[in-house]
């Protein structure tokens, strides 16, 4: 997902300019460090803590080691008290530079927000540090497909080699999943709001393109301001029979959905993975009211436990069993699964290069383009030469009793 970036969401031209490390590099000794950078304050705190719980579980299962190498885990907060629930530009850059300055760094897991990765990726790429995101979906981080901006993704890779991968499908797939669902639900037209972030605006463009392809008329695509007290005047414009809120909870999207539902009670409501959290779904946690939740569907790039069991995914079953043993619940936030696979991918890549697990260049080269037929908690996938997963299945969720409830698998293909 992806999403927010405080201060200047697109201001990344100077990123890494004061970092003197060159591309690549080998860590001396047998002690390696994996950094995690996520927003640990505000509305994204719950999702980020879920990611961390998955990362820690995977590392614990490995005994905090890969071959002869010991692995240290360091968790960083890319949000601030002034900008909670989002990747703060200055803090994100500091986190990336901290990892660069640590000579034992072998991998960096983050950011949660696509806008944050726009900042950290050039810094880390210049230093040759492999980076894996559990949640970025913005297409421009890896390709110049529709939904990206001019100069992307080249400007994020100053070392001219790929060092970044993600374990979730990009937003051309999520846009298609939302459009496919709307078509199946009988939508004739859709009005889109976007939160103006890298994630929200980019996904909105993908939804527009995908909706037109399946014959759903796009009535509008309007940006929202997170600081607005309400969105009644904007919501009054929504006359379509369906609505997509392309944003994240932290950009005031509980209020957005409430106001649209009040202005157009008959409209079917749809949200992306950016609102797939209790802070949005649960009224007890200041989420949307139950009557709004009853007509809202959410797309998430992971599937329900029963679907995993039906497919006979042994990796998924082990994850849920071990997660319950460690944390006391067999029903974790979906982002715990992403966090788990992010760490597993990092560790398995280190294992694959053997004695070169301390060689950043070797690790990055193995991860991007050589990850083939990987059996994982998410299913079997490759990481292509751009750093994208070949997984395309999306889960469709409804909201019941304030919780996301798996409904079905969406089969969709991006453009």
Regions found by a protein language model. Give the residues of each.
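Bacterial signal peptide processing site
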Residues: 16-19
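Sec-dependent N-terminal signal peptides
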Residues: 1-6
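Extracytoplasmic "Venus flytrap"
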Residues: 24-56, 62, 66, 76-89, ...
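Beta-alpha junction/loop-to-helix N-cap segments that form part of ligand/metal-binding clefts
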Residues: 22, 46-50, 65-151, 223-229, ...
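C-terminal motif of bacterial Sec signal peptides marking the signal peptidase cleavage site
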Residues: 9-14
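Extracytoplasmic ligand/sensor domains, especially the bilobed periplasmic-binding protein
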Residues: 105-222, 268-270, 274-291
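Segments of small-molecule ligand-sensing domains
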Residues: 322-337, 347-406
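Extracellular/periplasmic periplasmic-binding protein-like sensory domains
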Residues: 259-339, 404-406, 410-412
């Amino acid at each position: 997902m992806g999403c927010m970036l405080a201060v200047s969401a697109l201001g990344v031209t100077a990123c890494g300019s004061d970092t003197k490390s060159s591309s690549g590099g080998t860590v001396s000794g047998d002690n390696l460090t994996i950094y995690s950078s996520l927003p640990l304050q505000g509305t994204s705190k719950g999702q980020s803590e879920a990611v961390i719980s998955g990362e820690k579980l995977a590392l614990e299962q490995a005994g905090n080691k890969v071959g002869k190498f010991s692995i240290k885990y360091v968790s960083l907060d890319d949000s601030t008290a002034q900008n909670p629930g989002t990747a703060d530009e200055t803090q994100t850059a500091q986190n990336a530079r901290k990892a660069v300055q640590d000579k034992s760094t072998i991998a960096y897991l983050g950011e949660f927000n696509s806008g944050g990765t726009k900042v950290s990726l050039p810094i880390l790429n210049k230093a040759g540090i492999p980076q894996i995101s559990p949640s970025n979906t913005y297409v421009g981080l890896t390709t110049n497909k529709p939904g990206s901006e001019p100069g992307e993704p080249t400007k994020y890779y100053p070392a001219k080699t790929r060092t970044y991968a993600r374990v979730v499908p990009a937003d051309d797939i999520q846009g298609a999943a939302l459009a496919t669902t709307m078509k199946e639900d009988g939508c004739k037209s859709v009005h889109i709001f976007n939160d103006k972030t890298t994630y929200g605006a980019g996904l909105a463009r993908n939804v527009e393109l995908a909706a037109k392809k399946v014959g759903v008329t796009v009535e509008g695509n309007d940006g929202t301001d997170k600081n607005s007290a309400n969105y009644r005047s904007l919501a009054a414009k929504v006359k379509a029979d369906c609505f997509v809120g392309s944003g994240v909870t932290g950009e005031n999207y509980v209020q957005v959905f409430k106001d649209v539902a009040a202005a157009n009670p008959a409209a079917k409501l749809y949200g992306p993975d950016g609102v797939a959290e209790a802070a949005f779904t649960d009224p007890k946690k200041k989420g949307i009211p139950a009557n709004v939740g009853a007509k809202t569907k959410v797309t998430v790039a992971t599937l329900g436990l029963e679907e995993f069991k039906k497919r006979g995914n042994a990796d998924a079953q082990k994850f849920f069993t071990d997660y319950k043993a460690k944390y006391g619940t067999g029903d974790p936030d979906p982002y715990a699964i992403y966090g788990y696979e992010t760490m597993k991918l990092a560790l398995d890549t280190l294992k694959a290069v053997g004695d070169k697990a301390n060689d950043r260049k070797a690790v990055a080269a193995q991860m991007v383009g050589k990850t083939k037929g990987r059996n994982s908690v998410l299913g079997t996938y490759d990481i292509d030469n751009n750093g994208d997963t070949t997984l395309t299945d999306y889960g469709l969720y409804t909201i019941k009793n304030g919780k996301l409830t798996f409904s079905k698998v969406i089969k969709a293909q991006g453009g």
